[in-house]
Amino acid sequence: MKNFRSIVVLRRPIDEMWSIMRDYMGSLIDRLPDIERILELERVSASDGQTRLVNAWYIRQQIPPMLLDLLGTAELGWIDRSVWEPRNRTCAWTVEPFVLQESVSCRGATRFEQAIGGRGTRVTFEGVIELELGALNLSRILEGPVTRFLESILTTVVPRNLRSILEAAAAFQVSPE
């Protein structure tokens, strides 16, 4: 199990950051070098103000076709299930990868708080990732090092991509309807 945490402060008011991150995620991909597309699969708005979202994230990849065949997929990415709670400006989420679903568990929360005297937003992104690589039939000698290596990559890449998404959201211009 590996915990991760990232804090980003942006020069955009909290109400705007909250709405853009919840409602326009798919429009931010032009500024995300690792993400090919984000598809909203489900959106449910509850009477208490909560919004439940299910998004599919597809990554840009330079992975040999033989490796994709070995993984049993044509595309890499994950399903993001989130609950946006407006009362405390928190988004609780889980991530389910397209491959090795039984081996990877990732969950956490993103908290939005006022910053810069109300002119900005502090975003705290924290979670935990657990890898159980027994299904890969690695030798006991390799399982620990491989697990630590993958955890290290995931706990570095995920926060880096979050920073990119947040910076894209801070620069995003919402079109008048």
Where are these regions (language model features)?
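Short strand-connecting beta-turns/loops that link adjacent beta-strands
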Residues: 48, 87, 117-118
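Well-ordered beta-strand positions
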Residues: 9, 45, 83-85, 113
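Helix-adjacent hinge/juxtasegments
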Residues: 62-86
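A conserved amphipathic terminal alpha-helix motif
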Residues: 86, 139-177
